[in-house]
């Protein structure tokens, strides 16, 4: 799933960069082409901003599943506590990664476009 998400983000970045270049460099584009390019740009930015939110909600289900697998083989109180602690730690780390991803993506799209040589 992460590999697919990374590929999606990379392809979104490529399409967004191409749309920006089209809109900035070629001012003689006809109206339909400009509108289509603008709509693609807006759609891609929306998808890339919303994509990390799906991972945030999947943290709970993934971590709960891992903890339940651990608990099925749980023998004794100490082992059960380790499983419970693992689930909490897993959720915390997963959410931190999701927040970090959202910030990176927002920063990428709020930067001023740079001129490529």
From Swiss-Prot:
Cytoplasmic side: 1-36
Disulfide bonds: 59-94, 63-90, 70-83, 74-80
Lipid bilayer topology: Single-pass membrane protein
Keywords, alphabetical: Disulfide bond, Membrane, Transmembrane, Transmembrane helix
Post-translational modifications reported in the UniProt record: The mature peptide may be cleaved at a dibasic residue site and be shorter than the sequence shown (possibly residues 1-94).
Tissue specificity note: Expressed in endodermal ganglion neurons, apparently bipolar and following mesentery folds (observed in both planulae and primary polyps). It not expressed in nematocytes.
Name the record gives this protein: Protein Aeq5-like2
Organism: Nematostella vectensis
């Amino acid at each position: 799933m992460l590999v697919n998400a990374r590929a999606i983000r990379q392809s979104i970045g490529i399409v967004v960069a191409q749309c920006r270049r089209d809109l900035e460099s070629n001012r003689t584009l006809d109206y339909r082409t400009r509108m289509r390019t603008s709509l693609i740009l807006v759609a891609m930015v929306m998808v890339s901003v919303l994509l990390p939110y799906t991972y945030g909600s999947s943290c709970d289900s993934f971590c709960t599943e891992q903890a339940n697998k651990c608990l099925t083989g749980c023998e004794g109180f100490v082992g059960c506590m380790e499983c419970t602690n693992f689930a909490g730690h897993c959720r915390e780390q997963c959410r931190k990664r999701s927040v970090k991803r959202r910030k990176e993506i927002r920063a990428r799209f709020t930067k001023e476009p740079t001129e490529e040589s």
